[in-house]
Amino acid sequence: MGKRLLLDCTLRDGGYINDWEFGHDNMVNIFEHVVGSGVDCIEIGYLNGSSSFNPDRSMMPDTASVQTIFGQLDRKNTMVLGMIDFETCDIKNLQPCEESCLDGIRVTFKKDRLVPAMAFCREVKALGYQVFFQLASITGYSDEELLEVCRLTNDVKPYALSIVDTYGLMEPDDLEHVAGILDAGLDPDITLGFHAHNNLQLGYINTATVLALETERDVLVDGSLYGMGKSAGNAPLELVALYMNEHCGKHYEITRMQEAIVTSVMDFQRITPWGYQLTYYIAAANRVHPNYVRYLMDERTLPVTAINEILQRIPDDQKLEKNRQLIEQLYADWRKEACDDAERIVKREYET
């Protein structure tokens, strides 16, 4: 078995809850406690060229901003990473790695941007950073497309390639299938990663599934403190760490994570709760983007059976998009059909 590694993404994915406005003291506190717990990697936020520097926010315009906020902190033996959503941060915003406190950059991209994203990753790697490929919306890839991903990835030779279950749609069998293809196709020195979302409450078990893979490859899994993150949240870092201590021979200090939760996370949870919600469950059950469900539920006149019926009419190639015009048209069509059916019933009753 290869090494089993843990990455904390609280300051990045957790930012969807508070618009990345953690506050400087909380950012430092989370960093110091998570690093002190012994995690292998910590992601300190997003690099986004359209944002302006704010010491209270973990959405930063460039690596110089990262250096200002985190550069003087004791990183111990933890790999420090930032994330770029492809095409939101120009390469000129990145200093050479030797001038930065970042060890690596995770680049997330969707299938239709695969080739240009990998070209960008080459540029990032040329600056000296460890590069991580984040395959967003992994459920949108066919087996053949995953094999092509392996071919292109082997050519760039990143540190890691991660399966990203963006909408929390995967079950353990799905995950084992995808991981098996990637494990067989990737060069052996490329780490296989996994990032879960908890829409179907499977984030923890899916993460454990990846950790239990029979592979000589290194495996890296993500978690966030108290599961703080987009939609229904992520796999909770403290639970994954406990599992890894018990099953992977790790020695993470769970108490340090708990302290960070109490001092820097719970206040955000009280203001904007995350976790299991009907909206995200219905979206995941129908394999569609949550925005479609939000639109239909905001109408407040539709029974759940009607919501499911309308969602099932979304074409496969639009299920994970955010096509407002499409869902409006499907809703209008459903209403017309419902009205026509009601008129026919009334007419039939009148005639009898």
For the regions a language model picked out, list residue spans one by one.
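Catalytic cores and adjacent flexible loops of soluble metabolic enzymes
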Residues: 1-352
